[in-house]
C-alpha cells in the first residue's frame, strides 16, 4: 500500500512539474542568463540582457503579473 501511495505522489509531482517547469531554463534553449537580485524588475533584466522588455517577457513566458513578482535567485533567459 505504501509503495502505491509513493507512486501516486511521484506521479503528482511529475505532472505538477510538467505544468510549472516550463521556463527557458528547464527547456535548455537558452545560451545567456541573468540571475534576479533583490529589487530587480523585468525591465532591469531586459536592459542588462540588451533586449526589449517584450522580447525578455516572451522568451521567459512572463506576463505583466509575473514581472511584478520577480523571483530572487531565479535564472532568467536573455535570448
From Swiss-Prot:
UniProt-listed InterPro entries: LysM_dom (IPR018392), LysM_dom_sf (IPR036779)
GO CC field: extracellular region
Pfam families xrefs: LysM
Signal sequence, renumbered to the chain: 1-24
UniProt subcellular location: Secreted
Key words, A-Z: Secreted, Signal
Protein name in the entry: Putative uncharacterized protein DDB_G0289443
Species, as recorded: Dictyostelium discoideum (Social amoeba)
LysM domain boundaries: 32-78
Amino acid at each position: 500500500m505504501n509503495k502505491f501511495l509513493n507512486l501516486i505522489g511521484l506521479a503528482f509531482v511529475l505532472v505538477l512539474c510538467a505544468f510549472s517547469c516550463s521556463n527557458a531554463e528547464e527547456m535548455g534553449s537558452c545560451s545567456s542568463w541573468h540571475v534576479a537580485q533583490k529589487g530587480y524588475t523585468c525591465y532591469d533584466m531586459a536592459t542588462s540582457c540588451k533586449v526589449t522588455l517584450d522580447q525578455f517577457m516572451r522568451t521567459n513566458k512572463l506576463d505583466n503579473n509575473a514581472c511584478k513578482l520577480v523571483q530572487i535567485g531565479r535564472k532568467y533567459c536573455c535570448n
